[in-house]
Amino acid sequence: MKNLKVIISGGGTGGHIFPAVAIANTIKKRVPNADILFVGANGRMEMEKVPQAGYKIKGLNIAGFQRGSIVKNIGLPLKMLSSILGAYNIVRGFKPDVAVGVGGYASGPLLRTASFIGVPTVIQEQNSFAGITNKLLARNASVICTAYDGMEKVFPKHKIVLTGNPIRSEIVNSTATRSEAMKYFGLDENKRTIIV
């Protein structure tokens, strides 16, 4: 039996990277011999954080659209073409069984290419307000995993699976007490703390 091969793509911020790592960790826990490859944007946070988590990563030469600055977007069409060619080479070389996108620049060309080649694609949307990349990819996605109800306003209802947000096991299994956490973050236990 062949090993399960999964490409996970996206990043740019911890809000994309850490759920992606949680997905990879869960896959490895359930299918220990799974071969997982991350694809991110060159020069972005994922190129450092993913290898620290123990996974391989390849980078695409991609950047997002800079709102309000035409000058900063002059090279964007070339970067898009370069990233699509790079994604094509990665997908053809790795031959994944499935491609997972978590949002961010790199997931766009990677999932678009995987879908075009015939690889099933999964989008994971962590937010109640869907990101631009995931909105653009939704039409061709096989499955769209969401963290919140009501996402059929943005995504095709028949593709949505309510999964909640992927959380890394070291957070779920933490034995830290409330008191230890308050002390660690320098917060006063007698005051109400709201995280925004």
Language-model segments: residues:
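Conserved nucleotide-sugar phosphate-binding/catalytic loop shared by glycosyltransferases and other
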Residues: 3-11, 29-78, 165-167, 184
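Short amphipathic alpha-helix
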Residues: 16-27
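Glycine-rich phosphate-binding loop signature in dinucleotide/nucleotide-binding domains
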Residues: 31, 90-95, 185-189
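An amphipathic, basic-hydrophobic alpha-helix
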Residues: 65-98
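Glycosyltransferases and closely related glycan-assembly transferases
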Residues: 86-100, 106-122, 135-143
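Active-site-proximal region of nucleotide-activated glycan assembly enzymes
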Residues: 115-178, 187
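Conserved donor-binding/catalytic core segment of Leloir-type glycosyltransferases
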Residues: 188-196
